[in-house]
UniProtKB/Swiss-Prot annotation:
The keyword Cell cycle applies. Pfam families: Mur_ligase (PF01225), Mur_ligase_C (PF02875), Mur_ligase_M (PF08245). It is found in: Cytoplasm. It comes from Rickettsia peacockii (strain Rustic). Belongs to the MurCDEF family. This is UDP-N-acetylmuramate--L-alanine ligase. The keyword Cell division applies. One of its GO terms (molecular function) is UDP-N-acetylmuramate-L-alanine ligase activity. One of its GO terms (biological process) is regulation of cell shape. Keywords: ATP-binding, Cell cycle, Cell division, Cell shape, Cell wall biogenesis/degradation, Cytoplasm, Ligase, Nucleotide-binding, Peptidoglycan synthesis. Cell wall formation. Pathway: Cell wall biogenesis; peptidoglycan biosynthesis. GO terms for cellular component: cytoplasm.
Length: 485
């Protein structure tokens, strides 16, 4: 039954329970359902920003997973990250409580709206946030379900009043191809989630379906600077596709005259749409976040805005109002006039982009780049080991911790130390070091940080919490640290 149909009935709404409600994707859907008037509760192993936020709304949160948590619930929502042996899943199966995948619940929400789905291996969260800002500047108020905390809203999801919904579409388990979107964005396609897809061609095929499943009146927005995306665009003839890029002269939307610093990026845009005579130039667009990759993300948002006739003024205002996304090159502190950056980069391509941005800024400040990386998941490290060996070139000094398991079992020979050993042995980096304990990063910063340096703390695990606690850790060691966030 569609949620809208259920909403129309006068029956008492039954309780929806989220297993792993603190996850960024799960918490967003839970918040939207709660704001729509549904009874929502959930469980997670530990308290975090998302669980605290949901609790502040009055949503019941259980810490820990247990059979009794799903007493008196009518539906259970899970994501692909939840272990099938979870006691709440086992209890739901025993009691024949319907178990709904997160992607299916998202699809139900999107089915009621004109939806924009943002996918790609990297850049989804920032792009989703940028698209949302442009919609708001155009006088629309979209519902947004994002994969990260939007600084403008201090949440990853919010209920709007218009008929538009903008969502980050997670490609990790192919469920994104079933999302009923009207507009689809593909930022890039790289080898990722191969533990699920098994090979790269299958992953590419999923993105092909993501576009071809659009209704005939919809359109896709694709970055053809990325060669795999370009090839895909060339192969698809049955759907309208708007392209963008920086290096691709044949793209419909191109950025040029690019300038970037630690706090922002400024650029001009040339727009040459198919079946539209002439070229439009938008001068001096500014976004409050650095990096070439973020300019590309902005171009995707511009493509949507142009196609929906938002107007140049609304596009510029939307970017002016954008305040970034947490954990996307977020400056959290300063020590000894060096900037400490918290970043979500956990894939080799993301690491390259983050370090390239840091290197560009450090060079302007006569500083160096100190990278502290916490690998995430044994399976990712195993599939992309060779790529991880080659992605740290822009770090002047490199420290790698052991792997954050994220619930996975160890894989023999796949460790943070083995990565450092291979990097050193093959001479891919002459200053690569293994960091046995994350706590040792305090000493690394004290010993190495100098004025103008960029200290990049990267990963999808608990390194973010560590980065945000550095002021206290350094102070307790007798050193002064200025907190930025």
């Amino acid at each position: 039954m569609l949620l809208l149909e259920l909403k129309k009935t006068n029956q008492t709404l039954e309780t929806i329970h989220f297993i792993g409600i603190g996850g960024v994707g799960m918490s967003g859907i839970a918040e939207i359902l709660y704001n729509l008037g549904y009874k929502v509760q959930g469980s997670d192993l530990v308290e975090n920003y998302n669980t605290k936020r949901l609790e502040s709304y009055g949503i019941k949160i259980f810490l820990g997973h247990a059979e009794q948590n799903i007493t008196n619930v009518s539906y259970v929502v899970i994501s692909s990250a939840i272990n099938p042996k979870n006691p709440e899943i086992k209890e739901a199966l025993e009691r024949k409580i319907p178990i709904i995948r997160r992607a299916d619940m998202l699809a139900e929400l999107m089915r009621l709206k004109c939806s924009v789905a943002v996918s790609g291996s990297h850049g989804k969260t920032t792009t989703t946030s940028l698209v949302a800002c442009l919609f708001e500047a155009a006088g629309l108020c979209p519902t947004v379900i994002n994969g990260g905390i939007i600084n403008n809203k201090l949440t990853n999801a919010y209920l709007g009043s218009s008929n538009y919904l903008i969502a980050e579409a997670d490609e990790s388990d192919a469920t994104f191809i079933h999302i009923p979107s009207t507009i689809a964005i593909i930022t890039n396609i790289d080898p990722e989630h191969l533990d699920y897809y098994r090979d790269f061609e299958t992953l590419i095929g999923a993105f092909r379906s993501f576009i071809t499943n659009l209704p005939f009146y919809g359109f896709a927005v694709c970055c053809i600077d990325h060669k795999i995306v370009r090839k895909l665009v060339d192969e698809i003839t049955e759907r309208k596709i708007v392209t963008y890029g920086i290096d691709s002269e044949d793209a419909h939307i191109i950025a040029f005259n690019i300038n970037t610093d630690i706090a922002s990026s400024t650029f001009d845009v040339k727009i040459s749409l198919p079946n539209v005579l002439g070229t439009t130039i938008i001068e001096k667009i500014t976004i409050p976040t650095p990096g070439r990759h973020n300019i590309l993300n902005s171009l995707a948002a511009i493509a949507v805005g142009i196609e929906l006739d938002f107007g140049i003024k609304a596009i510029k205002n939307g970017f002016n109002n954008f305040k970034g996304v947490k954990r996307r090159f977020t400056k959290v502190a300063e020590y000894n006039n060096a900037s400490i950056i918290d970043d979500y980069a956990h894939h080799p391509e993301e690491i390259k982009a983050t370090l390239a941005t840091a290197k560009n800024i450090a060079n302007k400040q006569n500083g160096k780049v100190i990278a502290i990386f916490q690998p995430h998941r044994y399976s990712r490290m195993q599939y992309l080991f060779d790529d991880f060996m080659l992605c740290f070139a822009d770090a002047d000094i490199l420290y790698i911790t052991d792997i954050y398991a994220a619930g996975e079992n160890p894989i023999e020979g796949i460790t943070g130390r083995s990565l450092v050993d291979k990097i050193t042995k093959r001479k891919h980096h002459d200053k690569a070091n293994f960091l046995a304990e994350l706590d040792d990063a305090v000493g690394v910063i004290i010993d190495n940080a100098a004025s103008g340096d960029m200290i990049i703390m990267m990963g999808a695990g608990n390194i973010s919490s560590f980065a945000n606690e550095l002021d206290g850790r350094l102070s307790s060691s007798g050193f002064s640290c200025h907190t930025v966030v």
